[in-house]
């Protein structure tokens, strides 16, 4: 066993003394059992994580019943909704790397035989997944689950995205103070990740099709008994996989990454999934071309529109059959998935999901009646984004295939929000927000406030927004993010001027400014070099090492320093 490194031999008597002092070893034979880390992310300012201490206790009990010894440790967590729109958002994406590094440190320092990961919200799941792939120790994921959707006094279903858009509507006088406060009190009624197909739930659904979590991991409610039963089942599976030596890199293959994007397309997941999945591919040593994502989109039908793209919540999806029903439907179209891959259940993806039929065709459409014949995400290329950009086409009004407008440029999120609030941004504008990428932000903050204000003001079909920053999974409208290279790295988004004509073509998947190559080169010669905004602390180190979004926004040590 891997843990023999810290518990076998006379020379490890001091380590054994310390292990006895933990109280985790109940009898002499326990030293001969596998040591399992529970990598938890309990934190009580994050509603998606307030209940994870209880789930960890269930996991501990089940791991012990299965014949192994559990030890729990915690990672940090950032609530993107609370950190939104201020300096706190600079720390959200960078927290992913801290989580990965922290988990790697504990797992390798103590030579655990297996790891039970309990994530839930936005950066925690991908951070833990980076650690799982990096350490390649037998692992299983069981998230905390989504919260219930809220309900307004008028009986309207609510999610957190409803609240962000309500801010714009309230400022426009389209929503009364009473209705505004009612929504605030009722949008988030329980613990769990936010109720729509936002980043947290998108990633937790993808864990199912990647093969590192049990079926229904992405949709079973946080407050449900099924969630607790799933924790127990996952614990027994993990201990069995330790004995069989099934590791993450046996499961996370190029085909698994393909299938993750296919499910993402079918569910219209968050654009952040592209960022995180590319980072996972990089960590797994898989060279993954962005154009491959478009090829997957072309052959994957869009089957389930979930909030913010509709009024349906994750609970509605669960009741309609969950991810297993969507995966089963996709398997009926040959070439869409790779169903004979190994998963953490010890069975194939096909065996996990075959026969799981759709229970409500309003929530999950069939192959014969998709929302669209192509997936809900697209990668755009062009002279603004030579290395790619991402748009959630499932969140764009279906009538819009090509949008051309006049650029109105801002070098920060805050400048753009002020202009939108002051009605400087008008119909026909393409809002350009730059120097908000991984390096420029720093931290690639989410642009939820400006997109929500645009939609809340009723301009969702009349104003577009493009940025080298990113979006919340709650974003909808004509919103293009992850533009690469970013402005801080000399990307052409930094060359756009007010009044330039910008075209977003969803048919041909292009993003261009109507300027000649010569003019753009002339502008580049006059461009001032980017100066880092933060000079000390973690964000200064992050700025120095982070790459653009087309590589997943990973931190990379320059080769000349290795």
Curated annotation (Swiss-Prot):
**Which residues are listed for Mg(2+) binding in this entry?**
80, 122-123, 446
- UniProt keyword annotations, A-Z: 2Fe-2S, Amino-acid biosynthesis, Branched-chain amino acid biosynthesis, Iron, Iron-sulfur, Lyase, Magnesium, Metal-binding
Enzymatic class: lyase
> Mind telling me which InterPro entries this protein's record contains?
Dihydro-acid_dehy_C (IPR042096), DihydroxyA_deHydtase (IPR004404), DiOHA_6PGluconate_deHydtase_CS (IPR020558), ILV_EDD_C (IPR056740), ILV_EDD_N (IPR000581), IlvD/EDD_N (IPR037237)
Q: What is its EC number?
A: 4.2.1.9
Cofactors: [2Fe-2S] cluster; Mg(2+)
| Cofactor-binding details, from the entry | Binds 1 [2Fe-2S] cluster per subunit. This cluster acts as a Lewis acid cofactor.
What do we know about how this protein assembles, alone or with others?
Homodimer.
Name of the protein: Dihydroxy-acid dehydratase
What is the organism of origin for this protein?
A: Staphylococcus haemolyticus (strain JCSC1435)
